């Protein structure tokens, strides 16, 4: 009869160096795409030529850059601030999300003003409807994050459960923002400037950071939180 040792946990298999570098490379690429795509939309919009021209600029800053970077802050492999403490990264996360909300509000204001000046109807496309829902969900996420920042003042009793909700809903909000961006590429404004193969390339660019963020949250954080609860 073989003796069995109780309480021992087998050591996890060491990750191959190539796999580790590929994971890091995917994170770097996500940062570059988030920044590059934002710059691309800014140049394409030619800000200042009209009220509408500011709408894609601020929305790209809000969701393609600020929100993406605020989420990637917590990645152990993809964060640009991996050397900072968790407390510092939480503050940076709040700064990034605050910037995202401010830019989103400005983008919303410009599109409303443009519609009013042009005497055009509001909320007549899937892009506008999903975008409006994304803005509402972003506001809800901000309130949830505020409760986590000050749990005693908000009288939160189950912080771990609220963190899980915040993580899950945050991923949903970012995916909603990605869908809104993709729907914007079907607009007359975008298709009049970008056509053919370039249009399909642009359609795929926002999906890459979304996949990286989805993998980050689902594989490295959510399982642990479920165990804690």
Swiss-Prot record:
<dbReference type="InterPro" id="IPR006593">
    <property type="entry name" value="Cyt_b561/ferric_Rdtase_TM"/>
</dbReference>
<keyword id="KW-0813">Transport</keyword>
<keyword id="KW-0472">Membrane</keyword>
<feature type="topological domain" description="Cytoplasmic">
    <location>
        <begin position="1"/>
        <end position="24"/>
    </location>
</feature>
<keyword id="KW-1278">Translocase</keyword>
<feature type="binding site" description="axial binding residue">
    <location>
        <position position="93"/>
    </location>
    <ligand>
        <name>heme b 2</name>
    </ligand>
</feature>
<dbReference type="GO" id="GO:0140571">
    <property type="term" value="F:transmembrane ascorbate ferrireductase activity"/>
</dbReference>
<feature type="binding site" description="axial binding residue">
    <location>
        <position position="166"/>
    </location>
    <ligand>
        <name>heme b 2</name>
    </ligand>
</feature>
<keyword id="KW-0479">Metal-binding</keyword>
<dbReference type="GO" id="GO:0140575">
    <property type="term" value="F:transmembrane monodehydroascorbate reductase activity"/>
</dbReference>
<feature type="domain" description="Cytochrome b561">
    <location>
        <begin position="22"/>
        <end position="224"/>
    </location>
</feature>
<feature type="topological domain" description="Lumenal">
    <location>
        <begin position="46"/>
        <end position="53"/>
    </location>
</feature>
<feature type="topological domain" description="Cytoplasmic">
    <location>
        <begin position="75"/>
        <end position="91"/>
    </location>
</feature>
<keyword id="KW-0812">Transmembrane</keyword>
<keyword id="KW-1133">Transmembrane helix</keyword>
<feature type="transmembrane region" description="Helical">
    <location>
        <begin position="92"/>
        <end position="112"/>
    </location>
</feature>
<comment type="function">
    <text>Probable transmembrane reductase that may use ascorbate as an electron donor and transfer electrons across membranes to reduce monodehydro-L-ascorbate radical and iron cations Fe(3+) in another cellular compartment.</text>
</comment>
<feature type="topological domain" description="Lumenal">
    <location>
        <begin position="191"/>
        <end position="193"/>
    </location>
</feature>
<feature type="topological domain" description="Lumenal">
    <location>
        <begin position="113"/>
        <end position="128"/>
    </location>
</feature>
<dbReference type="InterPro" id="IPR045150">
    <property type="entry name" value="CYB561D1/2"/>
</dbReference>
<feature type="transmembrane region" description="Helical">
    <location>
        <begin position="194"/>
        <end position="214"/>
    </location>
</feature>
<dbReference type="GO" id="GO:0046872">
    <property type="term" value="F:metal ion binding"/>
</dbReference>
<dbReference type="GO" id="GO:0016020">
    <property type="term" value="C:membrane"/>
</dbReference>
<keyword id="KW-0249">Electron transport</keyword>
<feature type="transmembrane region" description="Helical">
    <location>
        <begin position="170"/>
        <end position="190"/>
    </location>
</feature>
<keyword id="KW-0408">Iron</keyword>
<dbReference type="Pfam" id="PF03188">
    <property type="entry name" value="Cytochrom_B561"/>
</dbReference>
<feature type="topological domain" description="Cytoplasmic">
    <location>
        <begin position="150"/>
        <end position="169"/>
    </location>
</feature>
<feature type="transmembrane region" description="Helical">
    <location>
        <begin position="25"/>
        <end position="45"/>
    </location>
</feature>
<feature type="binding site" description="axial binding residue">
    <location>
        <position position="127"/>
    </location>
    <ligand>
        <name>heme b 1</name>
    </ligand>
</feature>
<keyword id="KW-0349">Heme</keyword>
<feature type="transmembrane region" description="Helical">
    <location>
        <begin position="129"/>
        <end position="149"/>
    </location>
</feature>
<feature type="topological domain" description="Cytoplasmic">
    <location>
        <begin position="215"/>
        <end position="229"/>
    </location>
</feature>
<feature type="transmembrane region" description="Helical">
    <location>
        <begin position="54"/>
        <end position="74"/>
    </location>
</feature>
<feature type="binding site" description="axial binding residue">
    <location>
        <position position="55"/>
    </location>
    <ligand>
        <name>heme b 1</name>
    </ligand>
</feature>
<protein>
    <recommendedName>
        <fullName>Probable transmembrane reductase CYB561D1</fullName>
        <ecNumber>7.2.1.3</ecNumber>
    </recommendedName>
</protein>
């Amino acid at each position: 009869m073989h003796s069995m040792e109780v309480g021992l946990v087998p050591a996890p298999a060491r990750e191959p160096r190539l796999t580790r570098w590929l994971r890091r490379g995917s994170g770097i690429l996500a940062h570059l795409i988030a920044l590059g795509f934002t710059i691309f939309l800014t140049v394409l919009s030619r800000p200042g030529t009209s009220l509408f021209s500011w709408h894609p600029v601020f929305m790209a800053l809000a969701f393609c850059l600020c929100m993406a970077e605020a989420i990637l802050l917590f990645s152990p492999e993809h964060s640009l601030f991996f050397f900072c403490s968790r407390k510092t990264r939480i503050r940076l996360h709040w700064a990034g999300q605050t910037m995202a909300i401010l830019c989103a509000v400005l983008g919303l204001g410009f599109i409303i003003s443009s519609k009013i000046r042009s005497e055009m109807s509001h909320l007549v496309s899937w892009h506008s409807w999903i975008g409006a829902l994304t803005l509402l969900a972003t506001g809800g996420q901000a309130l949830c994050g505020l409760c986590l920042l000050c749990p005693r003042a908000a009288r939160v009793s189950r912080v771990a459960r609220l963190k899980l909700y915040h993580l899950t809903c945050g991923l949903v909000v970012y995916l909603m923002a990605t869908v809104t961006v993709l729907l914007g590429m079907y607009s007359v404004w975008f298709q009049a400037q970008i056509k053919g193969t370039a249009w399909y390339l642009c359609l795929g660019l926002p999906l890459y950071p979304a996949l990286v963020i989805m993998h980050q949250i689902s594989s490295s954080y959510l399982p642990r939180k479920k165990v804690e609860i």
